[in-house]
């Protein structure tokens, strides 16, 4: 499974990139608004730093508007992936992008049939939201399993991005259940390498070394 970072903060992206694990970035309108920066300029910064897929989301709700925005975003850099919401208008836009060779990430996916629709429309990635499903008492990880099985059975060439990651266990379980990618907030990325027994082991090694 590959690691993406879910942020529009350039400093967080730099720090994660320095770890040597970062394969891509996902952004959304809320994350960009939080930064208070020009959207296109920030995308230029990110795409110059990260060579993998960088998801940039359209804000139009109609297919025509999505296609117009998406083409403008895709023109910023060759590694831009146009992020499109899972709606009927979004599916129309994804189909149009697919015909033009523009990569897409269908977001806000909460059911397996939505993921199947995205795949058939020609999406490159599909993003089921784990945490938000957990919030309403559903099992987001079960959704990953369902989508992975459907894609396998029907031999669909599309990658699953586990999104709305809340904690390290989400990452582990998503990998076990067939997600190709996890897009992770910087706070959770910072927790992935930590374990109390690792800290305890280092402390003991140093103690033994200093007492030799």
Swiss-Prot record:
Pathway: Carbohydrate degradation; pentose phosphate pathway; D-glyceraldehyde 3-phosphate and beta-D-fructose 6-phosphate from D-ribose 5-phosphate and D-xylulose 5-phosphate (non-oxidative stage): step 2/3. It is an enzyme of class 2 (transferase). It catalyses: D-sedoheptulose 7-phosphate + D-glyceraldehyde 3-phosphate = D-erythrose 4-phosphate + beta-D-fructose 6-phosphate. Its EC number is 2.2.1.2. Disulfide bonds: none annotated. PANTHER family: TRANSALDOLASE. This is Probable transaldolase. The lineage of its organism: Bacteria, Bacillati, Bacillota, Bacilli, Bacillales.
């Amino acid at each position: 499974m590959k690691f993406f970072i879910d942020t529009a903060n350039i400093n967080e992206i730099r720090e994660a990139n320095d770890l040597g694990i970062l394969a891509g970035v996902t952004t959304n309108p809320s994350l960009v608004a939080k930064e208070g920066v020009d959207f296109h300029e920030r995308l230029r910064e990110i795409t110059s730093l990260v060579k993998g897929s960088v998801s940039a989301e359209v804000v139009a709700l109609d297919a025509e508007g999505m296609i117009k925005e998406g083409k403008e975003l895709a023109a910023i850099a060759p590694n831009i992936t146009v992020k499109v919401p899972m709606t009927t208008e979004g599916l129309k836009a994804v189909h149009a992008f697919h015909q033009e060779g523009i990569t897409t990430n269908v977001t806000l996916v909460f059911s397996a049939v939505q993921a199947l629709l995205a795949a058939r429309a020609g999406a490159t990635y599909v993003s089921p939201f784990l945490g938000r499903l957990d919030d309403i008492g559903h099992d987001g990880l079960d959704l990953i399993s369902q989508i992975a099985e459907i894609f396998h059975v029907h031999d669909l060439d599309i990658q699953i991005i586990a999104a709305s990651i809340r904690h390290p266990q989400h990452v582990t379980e998503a990998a076990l259940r067939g997600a190709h990618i996890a897009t992770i907030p910087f706070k959770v990325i910072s927790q992935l390498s930590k374990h109390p027994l690792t800290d305890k082991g280092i402390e003991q090694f140093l103690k033994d070394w200093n007492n030799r």
